């Protein structure tokens, strides 16, 4: 029996022009959905993008016994968890499923899940999560390969915890655990990312007590219970970065509204150095490229406020179109540049050495068949295809659906020759 799958078809060589409003950040929405498990009153999240990872999170909430439903572009959440075992098939699909364990431990004293999935971009251990939870009274049972069973037999209690690396996921997990733990938790070495501050803001709006968000030290006074609220998540700085890089790669002028340029300033600064015209104004940015792009030299990712690791592949796609040499090193994940194989298939002169992607000028990009290796690498291949001459077909669309809502429609509205189709194998 024939199997069908979607692919993205791009005819490159067309500039982008127009305005796009930046949607809510996936990396903010997912921990907010997990945080709703702590709330004893209804929660409404406004303007949530319809992503497959969001749908997985809603399925996890329903599996725990909560009500989670779409109301237009909002998500309405209510009810208390009654089931401590997360649906295995759903939990395995995304890394953020680990975030749901901390609220279940706080509410039910137990959490069971499969080890979380997500993009294969390198080692993504959860040892920092588990070490911190152990300091708060959590025990890990031997549940066999691929499973995680956590118990808090005496409930969660506050603790002083120092992270050896400012992991966003570990910071969010421990913040969620501490919000309803007994006593005070002091978390040092915490991630400073805006999405962490957004989670802290949400918890405070629901009656929690979190101080120091945006700094490397968080002080959380545990509450017996949290209420609810109506909350608008932070705009998506990675989506904005991707569209800014699309304008650089394809040429033209794109205005991005509803997202502070400070959230993705490193990307904008690098694009400006490469020859793009970048005009900032309040909550909007215009990125224009009508002439040549120049090499960026060597750039590095890092923890916030440095260049975000998730923005590295789209930025690399823009570098493919430059006349000078560029290299980009990701210090977070060792397999961040799996998209390099696709870049080479398009004609790019690229090579990888460890965590570094080297890009040399002179490669004439021509359309070809490609497959997205992961979420951000897939977006990078779409951007490179926009700059290539001829037709490209990009498989692995499910990766893109995890983090970009209506991606092809948005690019088409800007003038790209792009659409999705179902292919039959």
Feature names for model-found ranges:
Residues 1-425:
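Short, structured segments at the rim of ligand-binding sites
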């Amino acid at each position: 029996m024939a199997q069908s799958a979607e692919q993205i078809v791009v005819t490159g060589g067309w500039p982008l022009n127009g305005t796009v409003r930046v949607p809510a950040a996936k990396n903010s929405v997912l921990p907010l959905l997990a945080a709703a498990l702590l709330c004893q009153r209804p929660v409404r999240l406004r303007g949530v993008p319809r992503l497959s990872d969001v749908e997985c999170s809603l399925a996890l909430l329903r599996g725990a016994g909560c009500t989670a439903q779409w109301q237009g572009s909002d998500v309405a959440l209510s009810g208390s968890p009654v089931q401590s075992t997360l649906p295995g098939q759903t939990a395995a699909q995304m890394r953020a499923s680990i975030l749901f364990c901390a609220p279940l431990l706080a509410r039910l004293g137990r959490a069971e899940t499969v080890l979380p999935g997500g993009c294969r971009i390198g080692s993504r251990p959860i040892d920092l999560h588990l070490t911190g939870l152990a300091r708060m009274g959590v025990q890990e049972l031997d549940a066999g390969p691929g499973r995680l069973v956590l118990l808090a037999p005496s409930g969660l209690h506050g603790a002083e915890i120092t992270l050896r690396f400012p992991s966003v996921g570990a910071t969010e997990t421990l913040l969620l655990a501490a919000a309803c733990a007994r006593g005070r938790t002091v978390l040092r070495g915490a991630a400073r990312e805006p999405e962490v501050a957004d989670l802290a803001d949400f918890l405070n709006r629901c009656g929690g007590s979190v101080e120091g968000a945006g700094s490397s030290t968080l002080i959380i006074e545990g509450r017996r219970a949290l209420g609810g609220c109506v909350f608008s998540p932070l705009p998506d700085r990675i989506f904005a970065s991707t569209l800014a890089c699309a304008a650089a790669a394809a040429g033209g002028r794109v205005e991005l509204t509803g997202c502070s340029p400070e959230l993705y300033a490193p990307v904008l600064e690098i694009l400006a150095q490469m020859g793009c015209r970048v005009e900032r104004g309040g909550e909007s940015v215009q990125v224009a490229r009508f002439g040549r792009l120049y090499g960026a030299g060597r750039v590095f990712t890092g923890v916030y406020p440095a260049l975000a690791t998730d923005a590295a592949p789209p930025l690399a796609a823009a570098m493919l179109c430059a006349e000078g040499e560029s290299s980009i090193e990701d210090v977070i994940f060792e397999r961040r540049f799996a998209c390099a194989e696709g870049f080479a298939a398009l004609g790019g002169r690229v090579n990888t050495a460890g965590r570094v992607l080297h890009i040399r000028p002179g490669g004439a990009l021509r359309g070809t068949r490609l497959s997205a290796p992961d979420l951000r690498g897939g977006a990078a291949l779409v951007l490179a295809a926009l700059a290539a001459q001829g037709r490209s077909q990009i498989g692995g669309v499910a990766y893109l659906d995890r983090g970009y809502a209506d991606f092809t429609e948005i690019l088409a509205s800007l003038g790209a020759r792009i659409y999705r189709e179902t292919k039959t194998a």
